[in-house]
Amino acid sequence: MIGFPDAPGRDASVRSYDGKIGWMKTPLSVLGEYQVSGSELDGARLDAQLSFPAQMKQVLTNLRSLPSDTIDDKNCDIIQGNGSRRTFATLYFEKSTGLLIRMKRYGNSPIGRLPTQIDYSDYRDVDGIKMPFRFTFSWLDGRDAFQLSEIKLNVPVDAAKFGRPTSLEQKR
């Protein structure tokens, strides 16, 4: 759940994914709340599994190396792979650190491939693991930036947090 304390009336935005099904609650959008499907579901799966880099080969196939590039004055190694249902993703790793600094994924839609980009930064050590504390999520018509204040590893999390948002559950 993502709150917006500086925007009264915006309410919280919720994105959840339980490993099979995903949901979106965005209060100021036309749809408001809905179960994600198609390439949007593929994107939710990819976003979740990239939190655990060891799972990259399970979610992306046909991995290939692309020519190096520079992002924000950082030299990057670039890897691209295919996801499910003709989606694909391009991953940008900073050469000097090996850290993922950008992920672009492309999902199919009736009007063609739609890009989504996530930029990762402000990496800090969390129990011996470098974790991004800032990420910017950009898509065709919008952008959200998130700054985390704390990350805790291996703590119990209520399984309901990964399921259908409460407000959707109540509307059944």
Spans of features found by a protein language model:
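An acidic-aromatic
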Residues: 1-46
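Gly/Pro-enriched, hydrophobic low-complexity segments
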Residues: 8, 72-168
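Generic beta-strand structural signal
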Residues: 13, 16-17, 20, 61, 65, 75-77, 93, 125, ...
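Residues at the C-termini of beta-strands that transition into short coil/loop
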Residues: 26, 67, 152
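Short, conserved active-site entrance elements at the starts or edges of catalytic domains
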Residues: 42-80, 99-105
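Short, solvent-exposed mixed-charge patches
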Residues: 171-172
